[in-house]
Regions:
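Conserved alpha-helical substructure of the radical SAM core
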Residues: 1-100, 109-113, 117
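Classical nucleotidyltransferase
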Residues: 102-130
Length: 130
């Protein structure tokens, strides 16, 4: 069994960090049908599903449904996020993943938001989720 699989449910991001490679790929967001097909094929082969690659998972409108479906199919869902959209996604409080990883270095690589405000938003979501 493979321990983990990284899924790019979207390649759309709300930041433009200097450390992320630039790409000319068309913007794409995975459909529920694509996610269902992919996770069905991965059942029994993978334990952890990481929602992370070149896009920001919190931009995907179906993220809560994806997390719940992954859990229902026996996966352990993990999300890596830049942390800037968490307080805008209260719907995620009903579909929390096993682990939520917050990439704080996205602040350093972007610099659009003041560090105090950035940390406050991360902490607000963490307190609401606890």
């Amino acid at each position: 069994m493979i321990t983990r699989c990284y899924l790019e449910i979207t390649n759309v991001c709300n930041l433009n960090c200097v450390f992320c490679p630039k790409t000319t790929r068309p913007k794409h967001t995975m459909t529920m049908e694509q996610f269902d097909t992919l996770t069905t094929r991965l059942m029994g082969e993978v334990k952890f599903l990481y929602f992370h690659l070149m896009g920001e998972p919190f931009l995907h409108p179906l993220l809560p449904q994806f997390v719940l479906m992954a859990r229902e199919k026996g996966f352990v869902p993990v999300i890596t996020t830049n942390g800037t959209l968490m307080t805008q996604r209260a719907d995620m409080l009903e579909a929390l993943p096993h682990k939520l990883q917050i990439s704080l270095h996205s602040h350093e690589g972007n610099g659009k938001v003041n560090l105090g405000q950035y940390i406050d938003e991360v902490m607000t979501f963490a307190k609401e989720a606890a």
